[in-house]
Amino acid sequence: MLSTTDDLRIQEIKELNTPEEVMREIPRTLTATRVVMTARNAIKSILSGTDDRLLVIVGPCSVHDPVAAVDYAERLAGLRERLADRLEIVMRVYFEKPRTTVGWKGLINDPDLDGSFNINKGLRLARNVLSAVNNLGLPAGTEFLDLTTPQYIADLVAWAAIGARTTESQIHRELASGLSCPVGFKNGTDGNVRIAADAVKSASHPHHFMAVTKGGRSAIAATTGNADCHIILRGGSRPNYDRASVDSAAAELARSGVAQRIMIDASHANSGKKPENQPQVVTDIARQISGGEQRIMGVMVESNLVAGRQDVLPGTALTYGQSITDGCVDWDTTVQALNRLADAVAARREVQCRKFRERSA
């Protein structure tokens, strides 16, 4: 008798509810559909340069408490409306966390924060949160880590990110080529911008790859390519949000034949992983924009109701509205940062008007 050679390290396999089942239970509303489509079109226009507003992806590092996430969304929806003439605000709603080694992998993977890994529950919670956010009139952005999760929630996502650890991955470039929304690729963890530029170029082309259907069957996906992709500067061995770094990144994009459209992440290596440094990063970015910088089309900010972060400890209640992954700035600091960016966009418009008048004189 032949020895078993397969699944030797698989302890258990459970059935996963199909995307079709979850989407039927939590259908997308007409309001959510309008919000998603309007935001996607706005972001596309910002990327093409026909909309001079700034795209701002702002919200918690990760969602662990759906109630607090919707509370945050209600506040952000009002701010989005007030600053809509200068900023296209999209809430950061991240459910999956790539880990350098090990740790909590996000609401979808372990929604109860206890190692029970009730992924079927996590998928429903994620879809419910996205539905609630969109129904407030607030578009949502998230990071995708695999080829399966998008089938459950991508119809409620206006913008997606591919993280620094996965930008160089062929699978993720293929995924981006088939997503219906604009996608941002972060530079590598070491600061390498070339891999992000290559990813944007790769994702713009058609691909064929193995995937999963809404009915849960294995399939072959054939994509058209995604022309609405861009890079995200998130720092590496050193920060890369300054003017010299923007110039360097733009030169790399030009060499790769990719549009010089750049988003800057105020967190991660650009803040030295210290959330209290995010405001000074935003201030520097705002200064560049105020001076007429056109290549910066977006900014990311990690923000929550309460500043800082906390650990999940058995028997200890969590602080409401505070991150359990990376530290964030609090709500008041967020409002100040977004007002600063909105003022910068207004100043950039003045610079452009002045240049136009000078050329016309």
Regions picked out by a protein language model, each given a short descriptive name:
Residues 230-236, 240, 248-263:
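A contiguous, surface-oriented mixed alpha/beta subdomain in the mid-to-C-terminal portion of proteins
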Residues 304-351:
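Internal helix-turn-beta structural module
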Residues 59, 264, 330:
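Conserved, mostly hydrophobic/aromatic
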Residues 9-50:
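N- or domain-start disorder-to-order transition segments that initiate the globular core
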Residues 55-68, 326:
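Conserved phosphate/anionic-ligand binding catalytic regions in large, soluble enzymes, centered on
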Residues 19-27, 223-235, 318:
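Gly-rich Lys/Arg/Thr-decorated short loops/hinges at beta-loop-alpha junctions or inter-strand turns
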Residues 2-6, 86-241, 245, 268-269, ...:
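Active-site-facing alpha/beta catalytic cores
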